[in-house]
Amino acid sequence: MAKELTLSIIKPDAVAKSVIGEIYTRFEKAGLDIVAAKMIQLSREQAESFYDIHRARPFFKDLVDFMISGPVMIQVLKGDNAVAKNREIMGATNPKEAAPGTIRADFADSIDANAVHGSDSLENAAREIAFFFEPHELCNR
C-alpha cells in the first residue's frame, strides 16, 4: 500500500496547553511519521488564505481570529491511509461528540478551540501541504 501524506495543525489552544509532545506521541503510535514540522505565528492574511474555502461561512472571522491568537505547530504526517487515520485519532470536530481517547476529546475545549486541524482528503492534503512547505522541506522516513 502506498503511503499517504496529510497536513496537521496543532492549533493555538493546544500549543498554549503544552501538549504538542503528547499529540506527536499519538501520531507516532498510530503509525504516522512526522516528515516535516514548523511552529509559526500565522498572519491574518495567511489564515484568511488558508481557510478561504470557508470565507462565506458565518464562522470565518472567528476562525481566523482564533488561528492568529497564538502560535501553531504545523506538521506533515506520512503513513498508510494517513488522511483517514489522522482524522480518526483527531476525533469529531465538536469535542463533546469526540470518542474517548481522541485528541479532541482529551485536549479540546470547544468546537472553536478544538486543538487540531487535519486535511479531509488527499486533494486538500496536497494543497494544504504546499501552502506551508516547499517540497525540499519534506524528509524521507
From Swiss-Prot:
GO cellular component: cytoplasm
GO MF term list: ATP binding; metal ion binding; nucleoside diphosphate kinase activity
Kinase among keywords: yes
Reaction(s) catalysed (UniProt annotation): a 2'-deoxyribonucleoside 5'-diphosphate + ATP = a 2'-deoxyribonucleoside 5'-triphosphate + ADP; a ribonucleoside 5'-diphosphate + ATP = a ribonucleoside 5'-triphosphate + ADP
Transmembrane segments: none
Ligand binding (ATP): 11, 59, 87, 93, 104, 114
SMART domains from the UniProt entry: NDK
Location of the active site: 117
Location in or out of the cell: Cytoplasm
One Gene Ontology term from the biological process aspect of the record: CTP biosynthetic process
Pfam hit, one: NDK
InterPro entries linked to this entry: NDK-like_dom, NDK-like_dom_sf, Nucleoside_diP_kinase, Nucleoside_diP_kinase_AS
Keyword terms of this UniProt record: ATP-binding, Cytoplasm, Kinase, Magnesium, Metal-binding, Nucleotide metabolism, Nucleotide-binding, Phosphoprotein, Transferase
Listed cofactors: Mg(2+)
UniProt-listed Enzyme Commission number(s): 2.7.4.6
Family from the record: Belongs to the NDK family.
HAMAP family to which the protein is assigned, alphabetical: NDP_kinase (MF_00451)
Known partners and oligomeric status: Homotetramer.
PANTHER family per record: NUCLEOSIDE DIPHOSPHATE KINASE, NUCLEOSIDE DIPHOSPHATE KINASE DDB_G0292928-RELATED
Name of the protein: Nucleoside diphosphate kinase
Species assigned in the record: Legionella pneumophila (strain Paris)
Primary gene name: ndk
